[in-house]
Swiss-Prot record:
It comes from Arabidopsis thaliana (Mouse-ear cress). This is Nucleoid-associated protein At2g24020, chloroplastic. It comes from the Eukaryota. One of its GO terms (biological process) is protein import into chloroplast stroma. GO terms for cellular component: chloroplast; chloroplast envelope; chloroplast stroma; chloroplast thylakoid membrane; vacuole. It holds the Pfam family YbaB_DNA_bd. Belongs to the YbaB/EbfC family. Residues 1-48 form a transit peptide. Homodimer. Interacts with ALB3 and ALB4. Disulfide bonds: none annotated.
Length: 182
């Protein structure tokens, strides 16, 4: 009879390895301790540990020499490829910004009485006003300066968009992508 009780307890422990079973408890009255249950505001919650990326190859024999870890097996390679692409884009973007900062765009008013020069980053560099524009009065001069500034700004923006579009195409992006971001 003692061997029968030992066999029953052994069988129960094999079937329910994460349960506490007292000697006289039945299978229905067992209290499971795994997964751990925690009481929260909305009731009990359980904590489980699940393998997300497959597992290791136990026999270390692989047909193609690579570890097969389920559907995410090549995740590290994809991550490294994305990181390299980001680095290339950052380097190219910095180079384009430096080129634009060095470029100068001149804008003129009607009659070319006022000339405004902007950088490729739309930073004002200088304003040239002729003697003839000075004689027109402050109100008219203000309009001419504004007109010249708008002309220079428009030229700078067009050049910047063209340069960014060229950059996007050199990186393999579709040519019409930048037009949709207006």
């Amino acid at each position: 009879m003692a061997s029968m009780a030992a066999t029953t307890n052994f069988t129960k422990s094999m079937l329910f390895p994460f349960s506490h079973v007292s000697g006289n408890a039945s299978l229905n009255s067992q209290r499971r301790t795994w997964p751990k249950q925690y009481k929260s505001k909305n009731g009990y919650r359980s904590l489980r540990v699940n393998g997300l990326f497959g597992g290791g190859n136990k026999d270390n024999n692989s047909e193609d020499g690579q570890s097969k870890a389920g559907i995410f097996g090549n995740m590290q390679n994809m991550y490294e490829t994305v990181k390299k692409a980001q680095m290339v884009v950052q380097v190219e973007a910095v180079r384009v910004q430096k080129e634009l900062a060095a470029a100068e765009f001149d804008g003129y008013c009607a009659g070319e009485l006022v000339k405004v020069t902007l950088s490729g980053n739309q930073q004002p560099i200088r304003t040239d006003i002729t003697e003839a524009a000075m004689e027109l009065g402050s109100e008219k001069l203000s309009q001419l300066v504004t007109e010249a500034y708008k002309d220079a700004h428009a030229k700078s923006v067009v050049a910047m968009k063209e340069r960014m579009s060229d950059l996007a195409q050199s990186l393999g992006m579709p040519p019409g992508l930048s037009e949709g971001m207006k």
